[in-house]
């Protein structure tokens, strides 16, 4: 386990991101870069939350990686997986019905981002009730995914 409850993988990712934002190589980043850095690590702080962090942590000058780790351990809140899934499904569910077409889901999951192989998708979709209209209720799908 890494520092302050962060996993070694998280610390490694944070170090990599920190170094990318440390453009002049002095080992420090400006408080103004905190938001974009947190977002690059999966956080989604609002401007108000960032202002609050900067004020409560007295971030008035550039800070080093150890200080950054302390900040992340205290303040980085990644979106829960179920919320990420729900947000993704809502993009497909333009009418807000709670259902998405299996064909649309197949297209996206086998052709965009970290692609699933078509046979992987077929295995996945077997675990969900598909209606006679070719649609699935995505809350059921999310519940199955989160339970695994």
Curated annotation (Swiss-Prot):
User: What does this protein do, in the record's words?
Assistant: Potential calcium sensor.
Query: Metal-binding: is it a keyword of this entry?
Result: yes
UniProt name for this protein: Probable calcium-binding protein CML13
Keywords, A to Z, come to:
Calcium, Metal-binding, Repeat
Kindly indicate where the leader peptide sits in this chain.
none
* GO MF, one example: calcium ion binding
Ranges for the EF-hand domain?
9-44, 80-115, 116-148
Pfam annotation, one family: EF-hand_6
**Cross-referenced SMART domains:** EFh
Q: Where does Ca(2+) bind?
A: 22, 24, 26, 28, 33
Q: Name one GO cellular component term.
A: extracellular region
- List, alphabetically, the Gene3D superfamilies matched: EF-hand (1.10.238.10)
